[in-house]
A protein has these predicted regions:
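Short interface patches used for recognition in eukaryotic signaling and trafficking proteins
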Residues: 21-23, 72, 326
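A transmembrane-helix-recognition feature enriched in membrane-embedded lipid enzymes
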Residues: 4-54, 88, 93, 116-123
Length: 406
């Protein structure tokens, strides 16, 4: 269930850079390809990388494209080089098409601290993040929404407001539009020719549905043994991508380890040495799990549609109401979905048989809230390697930082 204003904000965010310029995709692909090939060369030279079950990624991407859906991959976050490291280890067939190169999020304070870096990471298909309700998340929802799909059942006023280009296509139906616009959405689909025209109006150009890769923990986590390679809870921004896209993406869990050996968090104060190879010869493993059942995702989306119908704000019907943003029922639904996604990633970890079983407390947002607020005093048995970057005083460079991880 999508809201027109969310899609509109997403398009406005993407339009901040000239993504529709004829040269953009060429330069973007060159940027991505150069970075990924450089990473691939370095990792293969200094380390021992292994990618497991890549056929599951092949199947998920093929299924997504065949069913006109996006692909969403979710992975644990062990190192600042997880991306591009993870993507660079994939076979070359994933690197040669700009529409198959993943989109992703990047920390605003690291990736977008200067105009030059902002251009570089935008060309690299990375969006800057600060908070759960922000332009980059709206943009991700728009990216995950196929260009010829609409979901306006709750927007009968659509003709009276400024709309994203896709919504304008429905208005072109003129007198064909019934009072129930949702019926028009279900029965009137843009032709392939119309879709090409629509894509030229969008703030980015693509010929296939997209792939978005997310680290739902939000922050890198490196813990000392026996808690090593555990995860934080998953922030519910990831849930918005699944609940609010016009069509549910194919969701594929991924678990990795070994990237933390390349850049250990306790090398933070080593200056330039931090970015030199550490632990040369270490193994790096990326393992793909099974795609999450479509029925499970649809059950969550069904509950979301019920909440949208019940808590729509008549004053701003095309947008998320305060209740849909911050109400307990909406937060609980997003939290449940985020926890479910985490369980799927955790199942891959546990199935490896390499690490001690993860402590149940690590999936609890309340544990991490207390641990972070007290800067570790609430549970001194859990030891960080390096810093816990979720601590607010370490995030002063983000004036809009909020602890919104329910």
């Amino acid at each position: 269930m999508s809201h027109p204003d969310v899609l509109k904000r997403g398009e406005e965010f993407l339009a901040e850079y000239p993504r529709t310029a004829p040269w953009w995709n060429y330069v973007s692909h060159a940027t991505c390809f150069g970075m990924l090939m450089g990473s691939k060369a370095l990792i293969n030279l200094f380390y021992k990388p292994h990618v497991h079950n890549v056929e599951k990624l092949d199947f998920a991407l093929e299924k997504a494209r065949r069913e006109n859906r996006a692909l969403l991959t979710v992975m644990n976050h062990m190192s600042v080089v997880d991306d591009p490291g993870f993507f660079s280890l994939l076979p070359m067939r994933f690197l040669t098409d700009i529409d198959t190169v993943r989109w992703g999020f990047g920390a605003h304070n690291i990736c977008f601290s200067t105009p030059a870096l902002s251009w570089f990471f935008n060309l690299g298909k990375i969006l800057g993040t600060k908070r759960p309700f922000q332009g980059s998340v709206d943009a991700a929802i728009r990216i995950l929404s196929p260009d010829d799909t609409l979901d306006l059942e709750f927007s009968p006023w659509a003709k009276e407001v400024e709309k994203p280009s896709l919504i304008q296509e429905i208005n072109n139906l003129g007198s064909m539009v019934p009072e129930n616009l949702g019926l028009a959405v279900k029965t009137a689909k843009p032709s392939a020719e119309a879709t090409n025209i629509l894509m030229s109006k969008l703030p980015f150009i693509r010929t296939k549905t997209s792939w978005f890769h997310v680290f739902p923990e939000g922050f890198v986590l490196q813990l000392e043994e026996p808690e090593n390679n555990s995860m934080r809870y998953f922030k519910w921004g990831i849930s918005r991508l699944i609940l609010e896209s016009t069509r549910a993406p194919v969701v594929l869990p991924v678990y990795s380890y070994g990237f933390e050996k390349i850049v250990p968090e306790d090398s933070q104060s080593d200056g330039i040495k931090r970015w030199l190879p550490h632990n040369i010869g270490a193994e790096i493993h990326v393992t793909f799990g099974d795609a999450i059942a479509d029925e499970k995702l649809e059950n969550y989306r069904k509950e979301w549609r019920k909440l949208c119908a019940k808590y729509s704000d008549p004053k701003t019907p095309g947008d998320l109401s305060l209740e849909l943003k911050h109400g307990k029922k909406a937060q609980n639904l997003r939290s449940q979905l985020a926890a479910d996604l985490r369980d799927h990633v955790l199942a891959i970890r546990e199935g490896l048989g390499k690490f001690a079983p993860e402590k149940a407390k690590f999936k609890d947002p309340a544990f991490w809230h207390d641990y972070t607020v007290t800067e570790g005093a609430s549970d001194e048995s859990v030891k960080f390697i390096g810093k816990n970057w979720a601590i607010k005083r370490l995030q002063k460079h983000l004036p809009e930082y909020e602890d919104e991880g329910h």
